[in-house]
Amino acid sequence: MPHNMKPHFTALGAAYQLHYYLWFKTHYLEPLLASAERQQLAKEVILDTCNRHDYSLLESDFDSTHLRLLISLQPKHSVSHAVKLLKGNLEYQFRKAFDSEKLLGRGYFARTAGRVDLDRARNYVANQITHYGYQGEWTKPLEFRNSAFRSPAFSFAHYSTILNYHLVFATQERIPIFDEVIGPKLFDYVIAVGKKHQFAVDRISLLPDHMHMIIEGTPSVSVEEYVLAIMNNTQHWMTKRYDGVLKQTGAWDVWQPSYYAGTVGEFTSAQVAKFFAKK
């Protein structure tokens, strides 16, 4: 979308479940969390930080050298900002309580988890077209599997992340506006949007009245920012390229001002929680 264009969508409704597994390590893997007292303080600081910033701590596990968390975030939250607040508050409170110079190492690991694992989510997206009863050769251009996609899609110097999201968008008033002609061109455009806004497309299923996507993102960008980038850019693109379709259907907004976003990963949230319980 050109820089001088006013965004069509600014505030959106959302249904979401965004779960993240975070793993921090102590400075030089020194046993700085060996005592029950230090582990208790760490848990209190993490709980307080989560409460103050509208995060939900679902599970936690500590040993002498590592902190492992399963947290739930809102679409407006970015992983990198949540990590910055959690680590910053831990450092501050431990410095106050124990006169410690440094508690945590520089990096972190972050991985998404969800109701279902990534493979099941991919299959779910791939089966949407037949699920809704669409059949025949004309439906093949409505499904896109990115042969160039590799995960991890992004690499960073001091931390490692694999952040996979399942996104669903419905057209304005569920009006059918997409077809096999628009589909392939729309997929190419969404890939271009991803390159600009730091997400990689894994796969897309496009139905006449809604779209499913699986993408991999970066920790510095929130789900809400990804969604706004996709919705605003594709709305502008449809207006520019297919104004005849929008005029005929009356769907000038293209999308409803709402969406679904769910995290998916190698393991489900329940599997991660079960792992914590066994520690």
Predicted feature residues:
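Charge-rich, low-complexity N-terminal segments
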Residues: 2-279
